[in-house]
Amino acid sequence: MDQSSYDVAIVGGGHNGLASACYLAKAGKKVVVVEALPQVGGMCTSGPLIPEAPNHTINPCALDLMSLRVHPMMIEELELERHGFVQKEMNPGYVYVHPNKDTLVFFRDYEKTADEIARYSTKDAEAYRKLMPVVFAFVDMALPQMRVDPASFNFKAKLASLLALMKNSGRKDEIMALVSSPAYTTIMERFEHPVVRSALCCLLGAAGPITNEATGIYFVLLGFIQKFGLGRAMGGMQTISDALASRLRELGGDILVNEPVAEIVSKNKKVSGIRLKSGKTISAAAVVASIHPKQAFEMVTEGEMDRGALTKVQLAPANAHGGSPIKIDLALSGQVNYHELEEKRGDGLSLRKSVLLIGTEEAVLDNFKCVGRGQVSKHPYMWITAPTAMDPSQAPKGQDVAYLYPVAMPLDPVEGWDAIREQVANQVIDWAAVYMKGLKELEIGRCMEVARDWEKRLNLHNGCVIHIDTCTTRSGGMRPAAGLGGDRLPVEGLFLGGAGIHPGGGVNGMPGRLAAARVKRYLP
């Protein structure tokens, strides 16, 4: 039997697994990353995925760089720019579009955004100016904790959060009301104009159902946008994963692709390595599972994982509301335009590089209600953009790629996806084409994936792109579940290192960085 030995084996070659490996290799550990697919990257990938358009680059999952700008440590500490990673800022990043073609722009400058709101309601603009300091105060309190291990004492982080709390002590009641209430309640309570309400519903709904309790934490998205801005990876999202892989090899780490893992080998509640489906075994003193916690625990040698712990991750919420985003990408023979929207604004602002948010307040609520019944709303709520507007290198000269992201689609439609896939794709494209002119006429080819496709292709439980749903009871040391968010698991030497642990989803490498720090404390 083919066998090799490492200090640490990383299961899963997504960007978190690669980041974890880089940090460990940088610390002098002998590391191997094992990936089931032909290329590394997981949900941080891009490439020519439409057969009819081999020169069009498709980003099948992640695209906008928000959390990477909030937590830029991976880029800086691992010197990824030296390995080819380049990002450019989008400003404005997000633009809400109302059915009557009115637009509301979320600028990076919150005062400028307030001025934009004043075009519709001076009262709402004033309400926005009063709300954002509360949001920023919460961000300032939360951010130090998001960047550290909840299993450690973190004196400096606690002090930073305490100082932020003291600085904003007069806003304590407002902060508590914000984060403990449904996001929708805050929107309805503070704002009156339908364009303003719809814009906020459309933005925050990307984090999940805005009518659920304690979803006021979704307002951090607004704080992040206006505090750190938005970016895009030039060349596509694969450049991030490729830069990490390049850095890992430079540090002496190994990468195996096309090698699905069959078992995380454990004896007497302590890992000894991994066994691949090919029959090869890899000995390791520690294993980082940069995959969904459910799959990780189920891979452990039968009888070795505590049944209670296994049950906790199996039942942890992953698209628990019955819905999930889907993705439709189109390769186009020309360029789409937003002339009608720009002309109605009349201020000369180009919207081509921005993400358009499509969906009224009523549509957002209806989409989330429909998914619970296994139905598709008549008016899909979606985010749409042309990545090639920011980066023309992702298509032949003068051509575009369209990225359509319906936010709330049923995980399992009543009719089944096989029966309605084409119908839904056409429905989404028809609706997007109302705002993205030329979309239908210029189509060369398309690709579409739903949550069950991601589950199959990426071994992603319930197709949940953030592994575990975002909520206050699944954050910090409670993520993925009570008793499992620390640096010790029921099987010694096993560490979780994906979006299912603190601080959660997003392309930022923070879970991988955290896992590496835990491994370094564990290994001699």
Regions inferred by a protein language model and the residue ranges of each:
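A glycine-rich dinucleotide-binding beta-alpha-beta segment and adjacent secondary-structure elements
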Residues: 193-210, 374-385, 434, 438-502
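Extreme N-terminal leader/targeting segments of oxidoreductases
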Residues: 1-8, 26-27, 475-488, 524
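Active-site-proximal substrate-binding core of FAD-dependent oxidoreductases
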Residues: 266, 522-524
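A conserved FAD-binding loop/helix module that cradles the flavin
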Residues: 499-520
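N-terminal glycine-rich phosphate/pyrophosphate-binding loop and immediately adjacent elements
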Residues: 2-147
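Rossmann-like flavin
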Residues: 99-213
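Mid-domain catalytic core of redox enzymes
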Residues: 262-395
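Helical element adjacent to the flavin cofactor pocket in flavoenzyme catalytic cores
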Residues: 222-271
